[in-house]
């Protein structure tokens, strides 16, 4: 019975060590809704950008049409995450990777929605990790039948942690294109433009580390367990 109690205590200490290490954690997460279509006025201006905090969400809604709209009148997009150069030139071929595909304009369940969580760490080898104080870029391009190339692009700035203090709440806050909320924090001159690459090799370097004091307690409890 004593072994079970010690194992339970050991598990609780380990759980505290791991889950107390996320400096970007917060109680309330904001969700930013972006309607990805050419009729969105914020895309038409060419300067669409949002400011987010770690653990916020980006919800991308694809174009959706009634069944009566012909296929050749619908919009379809492939969305890419790119670096700053790819964003400026609206070119994903040199340094970018495919993120989502809006390919079901007549979906019976409504518009396709894709969500991005701006998290510091991801358990997936091809997932993307975000850093406070850096900019990230999304683009899409479509070539209509008339050959005219169109480009929609979005810039996302992840705010520094000290500017993301949240009050306690029950529900996520949702912002969409019609909200009259101006971004109060513009990127500083020294803002880092993040490279558009998944976090394959960075996971090992960025994995949360257990503090030395808690590690000592953990080893002490393990030693006690082994002597029983």
From Swiss-Prot:
Pfam families (alphabetical): Ephrin
Propeptide: 204-228
Alphabetized CDD domains for the sequence: Ephrin-A_Ectodomain (cd10425)
Domain of life: Eukaryota
Keyword Nucleus part of the UniProt annotation: no
Record-level GO BP terms: axon guidance; cellular response to follicle-stimulating hormone stimulus; cellular response to forskolin; collateral sprouting; ephrin receptor signaling pathway; negative regulation of substrate adhesion-dependent cell spreading; positive regulation of collateral sprouting; positive regulation of peptidyl-tyrosine phosphorylation
Membrane topology: Lipid-anchor; GPI-anchor
Subunit structure: Binds to the receptor tyrosine kinases EPHA2, EPHA3 and EPHB1. Forms a ternary EFNA5-EPHA3-ADAM10 complex mediating EFNA5 extracellular domain shedding by ADAM10 which regulates the EFNA5-EPHA3 complex internalization and function. Binds to EPHB2. Interacts with EPHA8; activates EPHA8.
Function per UniProt: Cell surface GPI-bound ligand for Eph receptors, a family of receptor tyrosine kinases which are crucial for migration, repulsion and adhesion during neuronal, vascular and epithelial development. Binds promiscuously Eph receptors residing on adjacent cells, leading to contact-dependent bidirectional signaling into neighboring cells. The signaling pathway downstream of the receptor is referred to as forward signaling while the signaling pathway downstream of the ephrin ligand is referred to as reverse signaling.
Protein name per Swiss-Prot or TrEMBL: Ephrin-A5
Species of provenance: Mus musculus (Mouse)
């Amino acid at each position: 019975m004593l072994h079970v109690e010690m194992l339970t205590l050991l598990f609780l200490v380990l759980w505290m060590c791991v889950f107390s290490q996320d400096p970007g954690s917060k109680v309330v997460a904001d969700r930013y809704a972006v309607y990805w279509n050419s009729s969105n006025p914020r895309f038409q201006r060419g300067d669409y950008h949002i400011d987010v905090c770690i653990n916020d969400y980006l919800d991308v809604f694809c174009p959706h049409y009634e069944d009566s709209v012909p296929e050749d009148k619908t919009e379809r997009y492939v969305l890419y995450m790119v670096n700053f150069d790819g964003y400026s030139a609206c070119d994903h071929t040199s340094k970018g990777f495919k993120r989502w595909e809006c390919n079901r304009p007549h979906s019976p369940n409504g518009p396709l929605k894709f969500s991005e969580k701006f998290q510091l760490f991801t358990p997936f080898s091809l997932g993307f990790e975000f850093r406070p104080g850096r900019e990230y870029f999304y683009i899409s391009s479509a070539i209509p039948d008339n050959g005219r190339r169109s480009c929609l692009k979005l810039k996302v700035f992840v705010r520094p942690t000290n500017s993301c203090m949240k009050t306690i709440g029950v529900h996520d806050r949702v912002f969409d294109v019609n909200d009259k909320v101006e971004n109060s924090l513009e990127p500083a001159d020294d803002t880092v433009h993040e490279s558009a690459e998944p976090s394959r090799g960075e996971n090992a370097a960025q994995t949360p580390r257990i503090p030395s004091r808690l590690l000592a307690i953990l080893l002490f409890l393990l030693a006690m367990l082994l002597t029983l």
